[in-house]
Amino acid sequence: EVLQTNEISVNELQTARQLSRLLDGFYNTTAWQAITRKLILDDNDFLRRFLEFLIDKNLIDQPMSLEKRGLVLYEFCSMHYPAYKIMVTIAWIEAGMSLKKKPAEKVKTKRQMPPEYWEVIYGNYKESLRLCFLPIDDNTQNGYWFGFESEIQKAEPVFKAKEIMERCQNTQSPQINTDKSS
């Protein structure tokens, strides 16, 4: 039931309800909160554009799984905010979503070896971790490393690091270069 008052029209009530669904599905969901917050803060038009996208795709009133919301957000960013795709991919990986789906298409999973230097963001590296690498772009070797516990089959990474090209004085827990020739 929709009521109209002198203060708000039926269309405005509909928009408020749809914005509430958008925020519940993306902002109030831990997996997508940081990227949604960043997009809201960085672009005043984001909420309007994303809401229009969800309405056009007939998704605003559909229940969506965590994975479906990630796929939708990735598709939207691919079309309208390509610079933010990397953040959606990081959120996708950290939420334990499949590394075989589109948001993780650039993730390298086969026989990944740790780099010479990295800055640990969380967790502790150990050789038993299965490493995956997400390059930040196609032109550099810089990117994010994620470590997964193979023996317990945990979907979420237990380790995350950012590759750095050379050792810096102010990094937290970098891997030390043991090569004497450098």
List each language-model region with its residue ranges.
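Hydrophobic, aromatic-lined core segments that form the binding pocket/scaffold
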Residues: 63-118
